[in-house]
Amino acid sequence: MFYPFIRKALFQLDPERAHEFTFRQLHRISGTPLIGLLRQSVPSKPVSCMGLSFKNPLGLAAGLDKDGECIDALGAMGFGSIEVGTVTPRPQPGNEKPRLFRIVEAEGLINRMGFNNLGVDNLVENVKKSHFGGILGINIGKNKDTPVEQGKDDYLMCMDKVYSYAGYIAVNISSPNTPGLRTLQYGEALDDLLAAIKTKQAELQQKHARYVPVAVKIAPDLSHEELVQIADSLVRHQIDGVIATNTTLDRSLVNGLNHCAQSGGLSGRPLQLKSTEIIRQLSAELQGRLPIIGVGGIDSVIAAREKMQAGASLVQIYSGFIFKGPGLVKEIVNHI
């Protein structure tokens, strides 16, 4: 109800400053009775996916709470799952500012954040303090200064540290803002990474006597042939799920709008159709052999339903949450 007024004030600020201000307030009320102000009552709509029981099909996508600072505050809003990160082995500042831009007319965002985060050890400490009752996903990536050829070592190091605390682990190989990262989506590089991840997963399962599923997050900027190859690799390596999709480099729907020429990944409404089409193609290729988590431009009940009709078992929001506020969570969970 009040979000349009809050949004109006926040949108007067630079996008990253607005984000930092909001997170400071959320962090401040976490663990206090004031968290009740954020609590939304949503119906239970259980979904079984990747061997896990989600209390409802709506999740928060990675990138909003990179360091796991506000898990409980965000959880109070009714999400069935929250994906924190992307986190890297070592802290890194990310790219130079400004690096986040609103395309207000299109309800889109362009970001070139560059995996800015305080490192995996810091994230684990924050996760330990949280009390979220839903499924917590931890999204992992590689440090910018780690050569792509050695990138798998970063993923394995993160897996080692987050395994005990994650409901599932998301492997981010599709951000456009870390040089060379998307090359890990193809051919031998992908097979090599997935084989190493499955070996590490088996080793950690034995060590912790608990199986934590692994999902791979892919880009929307893939040809049909590339998508077929990726689907084949995911099935062959028995990956537990696929998150489709990350942000796009395509600007065709925002041409001529303010900030459209900024480099980085575009998310929000302009990504909606593109990501849904990837999900549709992926679903046709996978034939139910592994589940799809649909993300990209979901800003309404209809957009969420479209993702699920295209083949997604679960859906996630991020940009729509920025533009529509917490009410979107309740609306989607109530009607999906």
Curated annotation (Swiss-Prot):
Binding residues annotated for substrate, in chain numbering: K66, N111, R112, M113, G114, F115, N172, N177, N246, T247
Catalytic machinery residues: S175 (nucleophile)
Co-factor: note: Binds 1 FMN per subunit.
Main location: membrane
Annotated residues for binding of FMN: A62, G63, L64, D65, K66, T86, N139, N172, K217, T245, G268, G297, Y318, S319
Source taxon at top rank: Bacteria
EC number: 1.3.5.2
Keywords in alphabetical order: Cell membrane, Flavoprotein, FMN, Membrane, Oxidoreductase, Pyrimidine biosynthesis
GO CC annotation terms, alphabetical: cytoplasm; plasma membrane
Any one Gene Ontology BP term: 'de novo' pyrimidine nucleobase biosynthetic process
Function field: Catalyzes the conversion of dihydroorotate to orotate with quinone as electron acceptor.
Oligomer and partners: Monomer.
Protein's name in the database: Dihydroorotate dehydrogenase (quinone)
Species the sequence originates in: Edwardsiella ictaluri (strain 93-146)
Lineage of source species: Bacteria, Pseudomonadati, Pseudomonadota, Gammaproteobacteria, Enterobacterales
